[in-house]
A protein has these predicted regions:
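Short amphipathic alpha-helices within nucleic acid-binding modules
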Residues: 20, 55-67
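Low-complexity, intrinsically disordered short peptide segments enriched in small/polar/basic residues
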Residues: 6, 16, 22-23, 47, ...
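Helix-centric, low-specificity signal for extended rod-like, repetitive segments
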Residues: 4, 30-31, 56
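Short amphipathic alpha-helical segments
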Residues: 11-38, 67-71
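Glycine-rich beta-strand-turn "strand-cap" elements at beta-sheet edges
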Residues: 1-7, 11-13, 35-48, 72-103
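A short, structured loop/turn motif at beta-sheet edges
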Residues: 15-17, 45, 57
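Sensory beta-strand/linker motifs that couple input domains to effectors
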Residues: 52
Length: 103
């Protein structure tokens, strides 16, 4: 079986006065094994992070670095719920990928 691309998605909410600070940190952040990174603004203060990784092993290897990164930006985020805390993360193997180019 060949290595499959892997992705993680994290929903979060930024404090209004911390948006610029958050993106300053993100501009300097680079995780080894991550091939692409997207952040979508989904509401007034709501965001969704999508990371594309070479494979699940690359993602797992960066877990300590991702936790350290979250510790760095946690103060910029609002709690989503008491159960979730400040992030709502999911991850998994990419099972479908379609590229659309200038149709």
């Amino acid at each position: 079986m060949t290595a499959q691309n892997f992705m993680n998605v994290v929903r979060f909410k930024l404090k209004s006065d911390c948006v610029d600070k958050y993106f300053e940190v993100m501009d300097k952040t680079n995780f080894e094994g991550m091939t692409q990174r997207y952040i979508a603004q989904t509401g007034e203060k709501d965001y969704c992070f999508v990371g594309i990784w070479k494979n699940a092993e690359a993602f797992a290897a960066q877990r300590p670095a991702m936790i350290a990164h979250l510790d760095e930006v946690r103060g910029f985020m609002e709690e989503l719920t008491p159960e979730l805390g400040v992030t709502d993360p999911v991850s998994g193997i990419i099972v479908s990928k379609i590229g659309y180019h200038d149709r």
